[in-house]
Regions:
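Adenine-nucleotide phosphate-binding core of ATP-dependent small-molecule kinases
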Residues: 181, 188-192, 199-235
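Phosphate/pyrophosphate-binding loops at sites that engage ATP/ADP/AMP, CoA/4′-phosphopantetheine
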Residues: 1, 106-113, 229-240
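Glycine-rich phosphate-binding loops at beta-strand->alpha-helix junctions
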Residues: 240-263
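Oxyanion-binding "anion nests"
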Residues: 169-195
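Glycine-rich phosphate-binding loop of actin/hexokinase-like ATP-binding domains
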Residues: 66-171
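Glycine-rich phosphate-binding/hydrolytic loop that grips phosphoryl groups
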Residues: 271, 275-315
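Short beta-strand-loop/turn "lid" adjacent to the catalytic site in phosphate-handling enzymes
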Residues: 1-38, 57-59, 65-74
Length: 316
């Protein structure tokens, strides 16, 4: 028996999954300040499993590890450099296990070596992020210091002008904790519409004439995703493929259609009939499209299991 643990944040300490020992746990704890809600709980989970299953080999897989290959110009913020040196404030990204899994699968599906491919992977769910994958390595991603950054999400704001935050804090007399709650749990599509924070409900409402805010929210969602994809064409110096994954990416037909149609100028042509599927692996671009688009259901558990098996076999 072997056991794999998903860890939200590995900071700059982990660029791949790691065998769990006392040193690994200490390192996870040392970056807990970057994920205060997740890393301490993950350590408790690891220790509980160690107590329940003594001697069973365990491996930690990090959501941030895949993005440790980003070049410095893509992760350093344009603020005083000392804050990076003192506090580790930089872009870390998230959903790395998912982005890596679907990028590898895309290469398999098109029958090409991933080292020769430029792919944009779109993990779209309650939390959502976009990743530029060059030769199998992450070189840019939309989430930042935390999973709050990037595209507008169901309850998260995504990227904002920082003065929006200070203005609201002053006007509403909010504490840092209060504004953190506002931006993480009360913003995004939910904040715009006031509807239940369920993407499916918001999308359905967007087709109703008396729900203009729902239509606005969906337009913002698909537009910002398309903008990030276009932006990553610069990072990658071209795009060979786009992958949609995650609950929204795999199941919301019209969302994929809207995003792809916004990118027609890049030579992406969507096959309307092929796109009419939910939760299935499918090519959704036409044969004459300059960019190949796929739906690829993610399987983070399988990816973690594979890493766990490989690492445990190495140390035997």
């Amino acid at each position: 028996m072997q056991f794999g643990h998903r860890i939200v944040h590995g900071g700059e300490l982990f660029s791949e999954s790691a065998y769990i020992n006392d040193e690994t746990i200490a390192k996870i704890d040392s970056v807990a300040g970057l994920a205060p809600l997740h890393n301490p709980a993950a350590i408790l989970g690891i220790k509980a499993c160690q107590n329940a299953m003594p001697g069973v080999p365990m491996v930690a897989a990090f959501d941030t590890a895949f993005h440790q290959t980003m070049p410095k110009e893509n992760y350093i913020y344009p603020i005083p450099y000392e804050y990076y040196e003192k506090y580790g404030i930089r872009k870390y990204g998230a959903h790395g296990t998912s982005h890596q899994f679907v990028a590898k699968r895309f290469a398999e599906l098109v029958g090409k070596n991933i080292e020769n491919l430029k792919i944009v992977t779109c993990h779209l769910g309650q939390g959502a992020s976009i990743c530029a994958v060059d030769g199998g390595k992450s070189i840019n991603t939309s989430m930042g210091l935390s999973p709050l950054g990037g595209i507008a999400m169901v309850t998260r704001s995504g990227d904002l002008d920082p003065s929006v935050v200070t203005e609201i804090m002053e006007k509403e007399n909010l504490t840092p904790k209060g504004v953190n709650t506002l931006l993480n749990k009360k913003s995004g599509l939910y904040g715009i519409t006031g509807l239940n924070p369920d993407f499916r409900e918001i999308e359905l409402a967007s087709y109703e004439e008396d729900k203009p805010k729902a239509k606005l929210a969906i337009n913002i969602f698909t537009k910002t995703i398309a903008e990030f994809i276009a932006k990553y064409a610069v990072s990658l110096n071209g795009i060979d493929g786009i992958v949609f994954t995650g609950g929204i990416g795999e199941n919301q037909i019209n969302v994929r259609k809207s995003i792809c149609e916004r990118l027609e100028w890049m030579g992406l042509k969507i096959d309307i009939d092929a796109n009419n599927v939910k939760g299935e692996e499918a090519k959704i671009s036409t044969d004459d499209s300059k960019i190949i688009a796929y739906i690829i259901p993610t399987d983070e558990e399988l990816a973690i299991a594979r890493d766990t098996k490989a690492i445990v076999e190495k140390i035997k």
